[in-house]
Amino acid sequence: MTAILDIIRDFRTAQGEVFRIEGTQDGPYAAVDPRHMRIEAAAGASGRIVVVHTAPDMSSLEIVAAEDARLEITEVFLAEAFAEIAVKQSARSLCRLTAVQLTSANASYTIDLDGRDAENMLGGVFLAGGEEHCVVKLRTNHNVPDCRSNSYIKGVAGGSARGEFCGLVYVAPDAQHT
């Protein structure tokens, strides 16, 4: 676990309750144990952020991608955290989410595709052993036509460990070709 923290030590720090991304970022940012954080990507901006949970706390992460924004968010759970992640995407935005649970954790994702040609990709893995319990919940809302989403969750649980996945893709009545 310390190897992961050593790797991100050289990343720039994403601090504060609101982290704004303007333009194109050269390298990744890291946020360690955010209690509440809002990530805002301006129109046409792009960036990469690694969020690491090292303490058994509640966490709330809100991600807002404006038109043509590109975001890559990696979330790593090293402690029994409870995280709620809300993503709101505008037209032609792309958000790639990667979730890695290496211990008991509970992550709940709500993704709103609110603009045409918005695209969301979520990939996740959990590894649970002993008495650990990993939970991943996902709700993807296709609120407008011509959106795309792709979700892929895999898990391994050994011993008495348990893993849960609950997912729903909602397509609004007028959201055709999505």
Model-derived segments and spans:
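Terminal domain-initiation and capping elements
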Residues: 1-5
